Amino acid sequence: YSINQRTLFDENYDLARTQHLKNKDIPEGGAKGTILPNLGADPSRCFEKYVDSVLDLLIKDTSGIKEPIVDLVGSEEILFFGPDEGTANMMDWGAEHARLRGAPWWKSFTTGKTASTLGGVPHDEFGMTTLSIRQYIHGIINFLGLKEEDVTKVQTGGPDGDLGSNEILQSKDKTVAIIDGSGVLHDPIGIDRGELVRLAKERRMISHFDVSKLSPEGYRVLVEDRNVTLPSGQVITDGFAFRNRAHLLLKADLFVPCGGRPESINISN
């Protein structure tokens, strides 16, 4: 918690700046908000309270506001929430709650909603971010004259997420490692592609990977594991700590961050 607390401002600032640059062609611009729950807190409840507090600022004459709201713009503002780390399944609730609060723009308040019932464009189905990143990857591979099937890759963000699942489904490379919320999956000869596709389609973490499909050199270390001996003989005393730094230790031709660890690309890798 203390580590994340120390890096929270820098992480949020960098994400907000990136979002603003990405949204340079639309009038609303871009921003980012982060929520750091206390240990043991319910993330869903934290998100709900966060949304409620933002709606307090956006909806005129909201009851319960104890002090006058400082308005530096002088006009009504509209914000749009998009799904990010751990909030993809909360977008429906955000829109529905805005409707209950009487917001006239409730339907556009969140993106990535269930399209069949609330409309909008589903991020995962259209693979918005992943398709953009894929173009960069194809450009690099073509420039270097490589064959994608021979390129090794480490990926952060697992098959349960929007980006991670689409990256698996759209790629043909030799993925040697995937690091997600549940742990680390590694196979130096390439993780079984069929099993990865299965997890991606079912949107499940690597904790559900069939380890019988790993080679003798492959392994899976989950965050709750303790004192695990790897095929190399190395002993992992703490699976949680190993998960947090694995992306800095594993080697591959290509590193594709699909969420996961903050500041996963830095001067050391």
What is the predicted role of each segment?
Residues 22-25, 67-68, 140-144, 163-167, ...:
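Generic recognition of flexible, low-complexity loop/linker segments
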Residues 12, 16-149:
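Glycine/serine-rich phosphate-binding loop and adjoining beta1-alpha1 elements at the start
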Residues 39, 82-85, 158, 181-182, ...:
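Fold-independent oxyanion-binding glycine-rich loops
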Residues 32-34, 77-79, 152-153, 174-177, ...:
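Beta-sheet entry/capping signal
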Residues 1:
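Active-site loops and adjacent core secondary-structure elements that bind or stabilize anionic groups
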Residues 6, 12, 248-269:
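Structured mid-domain segments that build the active-site/substrate or prosthetic-cofactor binding neighborhood
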Residues 115-239:
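Glycine-rich phosphate/diphosphate-binding loop of Rossmann-like nucleotide-binding domains
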Residues 46, 89-96, 164-169, 187-193, ...:
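Short acidic, glycine/serine/threonine-rich loops at helix termini
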